[in-house]
Amino acid sequence: MRTSFRPILFAAILFAALFVLPSNIKAQPPQEVMNAAETKLALKKLNILGSALYVAAHPDDENTSLLAYLSGERKVCAAYLSVTRGDGGQNLIGTEQGALLGLVRTQELLAARRIDGAQQFFTRAIDFGYSKSPEETFAVWGREAVLSDVVWVIRRFRPDVIITRFPTTGEGGHGQHTASAILAVEAFEAAGDPARFPEQLKYVETWKPKRLMWNGFSRGGGGAQANRSGLISVDVGAYNSLLGKSYTEIAANSRSMHKSQGFGSAERRGSALNTLQTIAGDAPGADLFDGVDLSWRRVPGGEAVGKILEEAERTYEPENPQASLPLLIRAHREMSKLPADNSWVE
């Protein structure tokens, strides 16, 4: 049976859309009951069918502002793939080291995702401390084994866009950082190739993302600013009027979950431009999701579902949320008519 990490799980939506945050991955911790504004946002997200996967090496490497923006402003299924669990980091809040520290930092990542709205994935790779080069890193990790894990996540989550935190050219300052970017590039191609890791195809199908981007930075005139080709800007400082917060404020709270590393940042509002440079795939025009159908039309026969969900969002009553149930039931019935092999409904 083919499976995906990003289904809407509509069997639970009749309650989840009104009372709890929808869960797109069974391993995620349960969410708290939503208020009226969060419920409205959840209804909006039901009508957006898109996904983005952020890839880096460790817990705390992720760009929480971009994840919050993707989940809240673009309303796509966003996820962070941390290649390791941070076993080799410091611990400022306890005595745990090694694998036990990895457990602590795993929980910190899950806590961060509950705030910024993204999902969380890992591979089998161990953080063994500072590494001077990607070659040294791969010698410890086992390149093909970890690559297979990254390919597995891509084939199951099926992202439209993949974004790396670090470049493949070493400016990340850590061998594991560079290795995570190299793996993302290799997995971008391998996930769509049935000859690569064919044993996975018993459970998943091949998947080819639309594009691979680098979330660039500029240091000493280098980084993304050194090559303007295929470069776009994203303002992750946008304000969410439903939540009464900007995505940088949400991100600050998310990042502050990395307590063992002493990480945290002050909440702030205002424009916060991020640069994204095309590494592989189709270069976007002005928008990260150019060329990607984010509507229910991407599922054969799904247009009727989209229209019903639009009506549910438009007629939602904050003081009478149960009034949306008849429309959600109609949408559920329409979803039951969709092809069984679509990856958006389970």
Where are these regions (language model features)?
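Metal-dependent de-N-acetylase/amidase catalytic core
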Residues: R2, R6, I25-L53, S133-T137, ...
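Bacterial N-terminal signal peptides
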Residues: I8-P22
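Active-site rim/loop-helix segments in enzyme catalytic domains that contact anionic ligands
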Residues: Q28-R156, T178, V185-E189, D193
